[in-house]
C-alpha cells in the first residue's frame, strides 16, 4: 500500500468515526435513560414499598414531579407540548380529557395490562391515555345529624330544593374546585341544557353555601367530618369519603358516620399517558404497565381514596364494607364537557354568586 493510499484510508476511517460519533451524540450518547419522570397532581400518593418495587423491577429511578391540581398539570403540559417536563402524565380526568387530546399531548400506547380492565373505563379508542382509577363525586350526609332530628336524609338532587333542607347544603365553587365542577356537571347531566340553570336558582333560594374548595367544604363546614364544628350536614364530596371517615377516626366506629346519595353521583376516571417528546419512552411504557399492575392498583384505595380499574385488584376491607360504587352514575361525554365547560361555569357564576 502506498503512502498516499494509506493517508486516504486513514482519512476515510477518521471521517467514518466522526460520523458515527455525531450520530451517537444525536441519539443521546447511546446511553439508556436511568430514570422515568411522572408528571402529576398534588394529590398523587403511593406507598414507599410500591415505588421501590417498580424501581427494582425496571432498573429505573422513578421521579415524581407534582405540579398543582389536575387542571394546572394539564395546562402546564400543554404549554410544553412536544418538549415535556416528564415522560408520563397521570391525573387527567374525563372532565379535562378532550382538552388534553386536542392539544396532542400524548403518543398512543396499548398496555397489555388493559386485558384486566373493563371497556367501561376506556374512553380513548386510540389508547393515547390509559385508565388508572375511578371515583365518583357525590352528595355526602351526616347520619347522626339527620337521625337526631328525625329527618330523612336527601335521596335525590330534587330533595335539596325542598324547604326541610334549607341551609343544609355546602358545595364547592366549580371555577376553583374539581369536585365543585363535577357537581355542576352532575346537574347538567341530570336536568339538561335547558334545566340545570333553574335548578341552581332553586338551590340558591334554598340557602346553598358556596366555598372555594373541598378542604373548607368538608373539614370546616360539613358537620359530619371528624373534628369538624361545621353546621351543614350535606356536602359535595366523594363516594369513598365514608370509608375515609372510618379509617381516620379514633377509635374506629363500627359503622360509617356519613352516607352517600347515590343518585347524585358523577363519575370521574383518571388517566395516564406517555407525553409526546418523552425522553424515556421505553421507561414510560414500563411505568404505564406498572400503574395497571395489581401491586399499584391495590395501593390506590388507601393512598388516594379512589377505586382501581383492574378488575383483579382486591379492595381493602374498609372499601368493601363502607364505600359506595353507584351502579348508574351521571356522566357526560368528554367532548361535550370541553365544548361547554367555560360557558357553564360562567353561567353558574352569574346565577349563584353574583
Regions found by a protein language model. Give the residues of each.
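Short, low-complexity disordered leader/linker segments with a strong preference
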Residues: 1-36
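Ligand-binding pocket segment of bilobal, Venus flytrap-like solute-binding proteins
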Residues: 182-263
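Early extracytoplasmic/lumenal segment of secretory-pathway proteins
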Residues: 27-99, 220, 354
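Periplasmic solute-binding protein
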Residues: 94-105, 124-152, 180-190, 269-273
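Mature extracytoplasmic/periplasmic domains
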Residues: 272-331
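Short beta-strand->loop
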Residues: 106-115, 129-130, 158-161, 233, ...
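A structural signal for short loop-to-beta-strand junctions that line the ligand-binding cleft
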Residues: 84-89, 107-144, 158, 167-174
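Extracellular/periplasmic bilobal clamshell ligand-binding domains
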Residues: 317-354
Amino acid at each position: 500500500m502506498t503512502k498516499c493510499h494509506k493517508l486516504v484510508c486513514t482519512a476515510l476511517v477518521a471521517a467514518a468515526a466522526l460520523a458515527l460519533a455525531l450520530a451517537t451524540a444525536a441519539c443521546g450518547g447511546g446511553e439508556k435513560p436511568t430514570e422515568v419522570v411522572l408528571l402529576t397532581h398534588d394529590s398523587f400518593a403511593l406507598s414507599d414499598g410500591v415505588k421501590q418495587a417498580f424501581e427494582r423491577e425496571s432498573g429505573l429511578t422513578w421521579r415524581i414531579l407534582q405540579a398543582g391540581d389536575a387542571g394546572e398539570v394539564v395546562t402546564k403540559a400543554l404549554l410544553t407540548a412536544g418538549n415535556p417536563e416528564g415522560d408520563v402524565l397521570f391525573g387527567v380526568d374525563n372532565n379535562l380529557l378532550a382538552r388534553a387530546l386536542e392539544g396532542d399531548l400524548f403518543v398512543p400506547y396499548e398496555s397489555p395490562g388493559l386485558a384486566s380492565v373493563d371497556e367501561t373505563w376506556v374512553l380513548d379508542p386510540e389508547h393515547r391515555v390509559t385508565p388508572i382509577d375511578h371515583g365518583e363525586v357525590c352528595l355526602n350526609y351526616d347520619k347522626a345529624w339527620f337521625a337526631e332530628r328525625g329527618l330523612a336524609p336527601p335521596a335525590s338532587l330534587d330533595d335539596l330544593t325542598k324547604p326541610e333542607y334549607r341551609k343544609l347544603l355546602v358545595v364547592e365553587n366549580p371555577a376553583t374546585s374539581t369536585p365543585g365542577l363535577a357537581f355542576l356537571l352532575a346537574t347538567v347531566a341530570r336536568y339538561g341544557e335547558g334545566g340545570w340553570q333553574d335548578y341552581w336558582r332553586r338551590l340558591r333560594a334554598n340557602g346553598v353555601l358556596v366555598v372555594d374548595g373541598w378542604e373548607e367544604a368538608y373539614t370546616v363546614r360539613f358537620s359530619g367530618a371528624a373534628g369538624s364544628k361545621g353546621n351543614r350536614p350535606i356536602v359535595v364530596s366523594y363516594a369513598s369519603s365514608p370509608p375515609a371517615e372510618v379509617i381516620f377516626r379514633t377509635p374506629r366506629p363500627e359503622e360509617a358516620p356519613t352516607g352517600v346519595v347515590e343518585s347524585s353521583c358523577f363519575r370521574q376516571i383518571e388517566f395516564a399517558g406517555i407525553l409526546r417528546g418523552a425522553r424515556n419512552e421505553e421507561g414510560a411504557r414500563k411505568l404505564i404497565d406498572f400503574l395497571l399492575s395489581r401491586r399499584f392498583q391495590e395501593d390506590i384505595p388507601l393512598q388516594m381514596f379512589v377505586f382501581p380499574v383492574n378488575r383483579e385488584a382486591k379492595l381493602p376491607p374498609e372499601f368493601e364494607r363502607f364505600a359506595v360504587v353507584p351502579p348508574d352514575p351521571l356522566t357526560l361525554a368528554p367532548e361535550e364537557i370541553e365544548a361547554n365547560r367555560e360557558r357553564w361555569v360562567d353561567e353558574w357564576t352569574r346565577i349563584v354568586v353574583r
